[in-house]
Structure formats: structure tokens, C-alpha cells
């Protein structure tokens, strides 16, 4: 038998439990929840749903499988969505991937599904699967799909996207279908990825489908007219009496967790068909895609008596006395324990134990006295256990990890009489920091680097600090594990939970995300924050060879309390001529240098997340001149362009709705609207007259990309223009200067082809395809083998001023420190201005 123990120890994080993020707050299942969980104990079916990104999943189908069919249904998202946009905040790239991971986990906590990932990195929009698989390591991503199949053992695999090129919607989408179809046949072969078989076994699914939809066929009307006799269908509109909701209502709640993508959904009720196109395997004779699949206990050798007992438990369940089911549940648990090791034994044993705990009304609470700690530090921990039933429950022992602190209690958990233990643990000096495991090693543009096979696919890093509770119930031993978390009472909210995390003793960061140097030295400030009490050392900045750094004043720190901060100033100068490199701030404690910055991701719909990133920042020596001294910036969805503009000497004022009147705007040389401003700020449309009046009187207005527009206004501009979904995804695509003498390409910086080298992820997106003759288009670009797109940058005079609309991804380029992007953006905000400021 394979090493199922460690494999499932990690795998359960994503398979048996919805998410550790959700588990931070101890579960309190209702009688209806328990009744549904008992029904599930007697169903041994598994479904794997495969797509490319967070929010690609069909929450209606996932909820239907989990709550109507009682199957174990897992969503395999090949990426974590790092390359997308963010509608609710500034997180991009890796940080966006962390946010979208948590949104997926919250969605699964609602629809009842489980979650897995591959190591594929979302590098941004891709126009075809060949490009996608060129950036992804096809063999490695394919191995992850095979691993997911072997770990989840699906009877049926359902792909969100077709593997057929004629249905291309996005290269990642089509690639996900292609990889799933290939993996279907490979997962059952022992000579394919044999290294996985140290931990799991081969598995051959029964059949595979493509979850088709009207939006692949040009609309609902066209889909209604097409011949669907070859398709399979199922009604997703079923009603769940135990939930008091229809499946569609549950699905809408789950989909609405994808807030950073703007996918809040209205709930619907009534019949609603979902359609499936057969791909391979044994084709059902009827309409049921699960036809002929044995999902009873008889599929497990020796399991039939367990199925009979589970049926008895379900029939005899009493909602006003769930504990009455516990004696039979204990018998079922013991029968499962006697089965040979295997997938369903592990799954159903864990599910049965969870139901027993819920029926007993047992509550476990393990909370630390602080939300964070550091290696070597001692932390107070409060442990609470209570049994809210009349059954005999004994708490025999506790084991706290990682301190290996065991406590023998022999405490009788009498009905509603709680057990409380206040203790402390010491975090080992070699304890790993709490951080997303897939971000621990350097990644490529298309792949994350995860060496541990058993971590691959797990949604989150396993929590380091846990408590094992060793009980006997009616004389029968049973163990549970819970993570140590942190909770606090907030007067306006009540009980607030967050993860308990092990973090470095000190964090360090530059105060800017990138630096642009001229021929003058520049002030570089770094900020230190204590992650532990009583730490001291020195701060500094490492610079590239040929650069010069000197500290201004004392560079020592002596923090008495965790949370203290101190800022240090350094003078840095770059060598002459164009050059690029990295500035690396550090805090030295003894012989160890600490090089990490801490980013906290905090929204009310996900658990708070701490991410550790390298504190290094990009620095370049470039000739960037700007004539606009005073710039007003109206933030949209969130970006870091204001800080970038300050790097080149602009005085940036952040604008709110109340500031958008023509008289107030007159003091600015230029006004910039942040990315997706019209998408995210409903009031902005009402300020258009003032903005356009500002332009008429001599101002420069730069409007960055939007994806849609408020129907209350005919245009984003003083003149008509029509947005599209056209984009250039190749960041190295040739840029043609259509109007080389236009002021946007000449003053104050002469723009050449060299200014478009070193760009990141993409050139731009959502370019206009139609525009008024008042506009000129200075640039043209396109992805390989595609037609030229001239709408990336549009400039129009309006009265005495200049209006600019651009889909160029400045929001990615400026924070990345791309010199040419700085030079071009400086020209845009300087349109119509006299003089140059180096």
C-alpha cells in the first residue's frame, strides 16, 4: 500500500475540509447541516471539474453535485488568477493570486465543493493554447492534472472549456480542456509520472464531458435554435429543503465571492438546464451523466454493511436530538477503520468523525494571545473544549504542535461544562515562516516552483501550529485536530478571527516600489517594523556594482516592542548612462540579514492574509523629463501610478468626487483618471462636464483603460469612441510610430523603439476600435500574425487643452520601473505644456 498517510494529511486540506481559511472559525453545524452530512456519508462518488482560473468554475454544477447528488466534487483551477485585473484594490500579480485563491475557497465553503490548483502561473491574457503551453511547462502542468485525478479519483471529469480549437475563448481556457482530455487517459497508466505512485495510485475515470453553454454559440437565442440531441442535460434549479434555498441561489452566493473580478451575482429560482457534451469514456444511454456509476458502499470491499448502517442512521436522525445518532455513527466509524487502507476509507472516516463531533455539539477552540509571533518566541495559548450532549465524552490528552507539548487531562466533558486550559508554547528557532508555499521559490513567467509533490495542488500552506484533541466517546477513542488561530472582539462587529502566523522578527521595505534616477543622487528611504519584542541591529541598502550608497545619520535600531517602526534615509547615486539594477534594503540582527517585506491583504469577505515578499525594488538610470508639475489623480480600481509620478518629480494630489469641479481642477497641469475609473466609480459620469470644461480651458486629461461604460453617457471622451476587447498580450510586440512627429512622441522626451523594450506582461488591453476624426492615433501594434491595432493611444485637442485615452498598461509598467513607459507617460501628462523639468 502506498504512503497514503502523508499524502492525505496534506490532501485533506483541500479535499476533506473546504479550507483552512474557513476552518479558522470553529464550525457550528446546525441540525440541517448534520442531516445533509449524514446523507453524504452514504454516497461514494467523486467529480472533478477542470478550468483555468478562479471564477471560471460553474458554481451551479458544483453545488448541484455537492448538495443534490452528495458527491465529492473538486474544482481544479490550473492557475490562481495572478495575471488578471483587480476591481476592489491594488493587489496585482502574486498578491492578486493570493486574494483570488481565498475568494475561491470562500466560494467552495458556500457551494460545498473542494479546491485544488496546478503550478501554472497566470501570465496574463493568451490568445491561443499554443502560446499558453509555450509559457507553461506543458509536461509539468499535465503532471499536475494527472496528480489531481489520482488524488481525487473522479468517476466523471467535467471540463468548463472545450479542447476543440473552434471554441477558443482564451488560450488558458482551451489549454485547460486539452490538458484534461490528455490526462484522462494517462492517469490510469503506471508508467506515466511513476514518481507520483510513491504517494498515490493510478486511477481511470469512467467518462468525461465538456460543460457547454449558450455563450459559446453567440447567444441564448442561437443556442435555443441549435440541435442539441447529442447533448446531455440536467436541471440545476432544484430546491434544497434543508437549506431553504434553491441550487441557483446557493450558486449565486458562491459566485459572488469573486468580488475582485466584479462577479457579484443575482440569485434565480426555477428550472435551469445545464448542458454537457460527451468527450470520452463509456457513454451513458440516458440523459444522466452519472448513469451506471456505483456510488454506494458496495464499491468498497467489505463496505455493504456500512452502507446499511448509514441508511439506518439517516432514517433515524432526529433534528431535535442529533446526539441520538452518535452510537450508530461510532459503530460505523469502527467498521470503516477495519477496512483496508484506501481512498474512500480515508475520506469517509474523516467525514464520519466530523459528523460525530457535530452531533455531540462538541466545540474546540485554540487561540493564541497574539495574531503573529516569530521563531524562538513564547506565545500564550487558550484551549477550550465543550460537549453539549448527554453522552459520555472524556478528554484524555492534548498535543500541541509545534512545541510537542503533550498534556494528559483525564477530564470528563460533562454536558455543557466546558474545559479551559491556559498554557504557552515556544516556537522553534527553525520554524518556517507563514507564507503561501507556491511563492517560496523563484517562479518563471509561466510556472511556480513547488518541489514537494505532496504540496502540489493544495490550496494553502498547511498551518504550523495545531492542537490534537484525544477523546473517548462512549469508551471509543477518537481524535480531532484544530489549528491555533487568533480572535478578538471588535465593538462594531463582534468576534473576529484571523490566522495565527509565524513571521520574521523584523520587516523591511523601501518606501517606493521602484526608482528612476537621473544624473543627481536620490534619497532612498527604507522602513523597518518590528515583528518581535527586544530586537536590535543595523539597517542598510545593497546597491548594484558601480552605484554608490551612503547613509544619512544613524542606521541602528533598537526596538523594544513588536510593531515599532523606524525610517532610515540613504543617499543613492547611479553611474552615468542608461543602466538598471536592484536596490535591496536589509535589516541585520546579529549575523543574519532580513530581506523580506510584509504585505497584508485584508477584505471583509476573506480571512486576512499575510504575504512575505523580497523587499528588493527595481532601479534604473534614465533620462525622463516632464513638464507637468502639478498632477491631479482620481483613483479607479486601484493602482500605484501616483507614487510612480512622484518619482519623476510630479506633485500628485489625490482627487475625490468633491474635487472634480472646473475651478478646482484649473490648478493642475494634468489630471489622470485611474484604471477602470468609470467601471468602479458610479459618480464619475456626472463629473464629465467639469472634466471636459477643464480640458477646454487648457488642461490635459488622461483617461486610462476601462472595460465597459455607464449607459448614462455616450462616451468616455468629449468625442465619440467605442471600446472593444482587443488587446496586445505580447509585451515584446513591435510598436510602430505612425505619427513620429506628434508631440506625444517628442516632447519633452523623444520616443523611439528602444522605449518599448523591457515591458512586462502585455502592451495593453480594451483598445477602442472606432473613434471620432478629432482623435489621432500615434501608435500601432499587434500580436504576432494578427491585424494592426491603432487604438492603444488616442489624442484629441479639445478647446485649448488635450484629451488622451489610452489602453496601454501603464498600471503594470510604471510600478515595474520600465524607463520607456515613464518617458511616454511623462509626455502624455505634459501635452500642451511649455518648458521641461528634468
Model-flagged regions — what are they?
Residues 24-26, 33, 186-363:
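The feature marks non-catalytic terminal segments
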Residues 593-674, 705, 812, 830-837:
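Aromatic-Pro/Gly-enriched surface loop or interdomain linker
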Residues 1-9:
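Bacterial N-terminal signal peptides that target proteins for export
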Residues 24-193, 214-215:
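Active-site beta-strand->loop->alpha-helix modules in alpha/beta enzyme cores, enriched
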